[in-house]
Amino acid sequence: LDVAVDEIPRIAPKDPESVQWPPEVVADGPIALARLIPAGVDVRGNSTRARIVLFRKPIERRAKDTEELTDLLHEVLVAQVATYLGVEPSVIDPTLDDD
């Protein structure tokens, strides 16, 4: 949770439609919904595992009800896993529409 709170990517563009996020961030316009943090080494020199961080409030605010929240979480997680594996989201879940 500390990572999610401390590291929410923020962009305040003049034109929200022109925001370009890196591939490890799933976003809705200028609002980040999730971020893939790759494996690496922490400050003590210990190896770390890759993590998917979901930004709860931005995701919750985009869902009208529980069913929509479930669908959005599924879509975001599929996108993040696909990014981690270096494949298209349709490889992870062929039922997703490619937008």
Question: Predicted regions span which residues?
Answer:
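Active-site scaffold of zinc-dependent metalloenzymes
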Residues: 26-74, 84-99
